[in-house]
């Protein structure tokens, strides 16, 4: 198999290498990073930090994604959702993908160290290692709580963006991390229910596989309730205003509607519907934070 992968890897195109970075996921991460940057300052963000800081974070995120492709290539080949990925089909060789990941990581770290600050750079590296090594290499195969524990690495981008501008940690960016951290389990568990048979075939201990769908649906509902509460905290600590509060309540209410429908089996395809809405939810919630920051309303 290794020989086959190496041989067929010669057929790789630039699109295959782009796919290794999981660009859709990285774009969503960069949106939260971008919002973190702008929330860190009302005076504006220096263009060098805005451009090269986000580029550095994006390159490191892409590096982590490429490592994920390498480690999961045999699992990916067993699942319909992932079997067309470059390494699963053998279009890119594992060593080539690892070299690509290393190049992205080095370039990303160089940009962060040059144009932002050491704290932002090292936190980004910690996030990269947390996802690529701790989650992908160990937690994903070890425990049904893989998403909960490993979600911290994926929740880091708004913190990274904030620190890239401010150069220091504070309560506000940690709250942004908490929002993404709490959002992660219902987001991924909804997909895991939809793809339960594939995860079981690949022997990945996702919660629906190990504990059943009813248990997972209950926990999706509970986490969604917790998420709704957590998203009210920016208003409670005067980090945001009434505009954000209204958006958080409306968006959270809709998320709760999907979670309840999934729990009660009252909608066809509720699992994938919940998953898709969760993506829109996070995007719109962070946009609401940003708009509220620059267009505050008073009651």
From Swiss-Prot:
Enumerate the Pfam families for this protein: UbiA
Please list the reactions this protein catalyses: heme b + (2E,6E)-farnesyl diphosphate + H2O = Fe(II)-heme o + diphosphate
What kind of membrane protein is this, topologically? Multi-pass membrane protein
Q: What is its main location?
A: membrane
Q: Where does the record say this protein resides?
A: Cell inner membrane
Question: Could you tell me which InterPro entries the record lists for this protein?
Answer: Protohaem_IX_farnesylTrfase (IPR006369), UbiA_prenyltransferase (IPR000537), UbiA_prenylTrfase_CS (IPR030470), UbiA_sf (IPR044878)
On whether Cell membrane is a keyword of this UniProt record, the answer is yes
Taxonomic superkingdom? Bacteria
List S-S links within the chain. Answer: none
Q: Where does this protein act, in terms of pathway?
A: Porphyrin-containing compound metabolism; heme O biosynthesis; heme O from protoheme: step 1/1
The residue ranges crossing the membrane are 25-45, 47-67, 95-115, 119-139, 147-167, 173-193, 218-238, 243-263, 279-299
On whether DNA repair is a keyword of this UniProt record, the answer is: no
Which GO biological process categories is it annotated with? heme O biosynthetic process
User: What keywords tag this UniProt record?
Assistant: Cell inner membrane, Cell membrane, Heme biosynthesis, Membrane, Transferase, Transmembrane, Transmembrane helix
- Give a GO cellular-component term: plasma membrane
> Which GO molecular-function terms appear in the entry?
protoheme IX farnesyltransferase activity
EC number(s) for this protein?
2.5.1.141
EC main group: transferase
- Which HAMAP family is this protein grouped with? CyoE_CtaB (MF_00154)
- Purpose: Converts heme B (protoheme IX) to heme O by substitution of the vinyl group on carbon 2 of heme B porphyrin ring with a hydroxyethyl farnesyl side group.
> Could you say which protein family the record assigns here?
Belongs to the UbiA prenyltransferase family. Protoheme IX farnesyltransferase subfamily.
**Additional note from the record:** Carbon 2 of the heme B porphyrin ring is defined according to the Fischer nomenclature.
Q: What is this protein called?
A: Protoheme IX farnesyltransferase
In its UniProt entry, the species of origin is given as Azotobacter vinelandii (strain DJ / ATCC BAA-1303)
Annotated gene: cyoE
